[in-house]
Design a protein with these regions (language model features):
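Substrate-binding pocket helix/loop in short-chain dehydrogenase/reductase
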Residues: 41, 66-68, 75-77
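Conserved NAD(P)H cofactor-binding loop of Rossmann-fold oxidoreductase domains
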Residues: 58-64
Length: 168
């Protein structure tokens, strides 16, 4: 949807114009948000909506495309924070709200390099393998204990700024 409040507001307006339910905007920087922000977000969503019908993990950063031996810790950590840790923290915080909804859906965005590693995709590929693992573990844990569906989706090549950066 976008990494700016301006883009979120455009989506908000489109939902309203289409006659959808009253939306809400809860900006959060996944690269730096402390754990407590995720609990705060869940509390705000719970107060506003009472439940959560779906959660799409689509936020992701590419990081540096280079050999792992040349990847800096800072670059590695940033990719893992946004692509893996934020998904874990947000999922954990939102699970009670998802479980309060009938047939809620939890969807992770994957990548081909998260299913078969490729040279020079380093931290991004590893983060997508971790995303697949998180999805599989959650799907198994919730299979017979919850109505929450857990899946991942590999959308294939999409025309995004991240893809243009990967393939200049």
């Amino acid at each position: 949807l976008g990494r700016t409040v301006e883009k979120l507001e455009a989506v908000y307006d489109a939902i309203e114009a289409a006659g959808g339910a009253q939306p809400a905007i809860f900006p959060m920087d996944l690269a730096s948000a402390p754990e407590s922000d995720y609990a705060g977000l869940a509390g705000a969503v719970g107060e506003t909506f009472g439940r959560l019908d779906g959660l799409l993990h689509n936020a992701s950063v590419l990081g540096e495309r280079r050999p792992i031996e040349n990847t800096t810790w800072k670059a590695w950590e940033q990719v893992m924070q946004v692509n893996v840790n934020a998904a874990f923290l947000l999922t954990r915080a939102m699970l009670p709200l998802l479980q309060a909804a009938p047939r809620a859906s939890l969807l992770f965005t994957s990548s081909g390099v998260g299913r078969k590693g490729r040279a020079y995709w380093g931290a991004y590929a590893v983060s997508k393998f971790a995303t697949e693992g998180l999805m599989q573990v959650l799907a198994d844990e919730l299979e017979n204990t919850s109505e929450v569906r857990v899946n991942s989706l590999n959308p294939g090549a999409t025309n995004t700024a991240m893809r243009r950066a990967a393939y200049p």
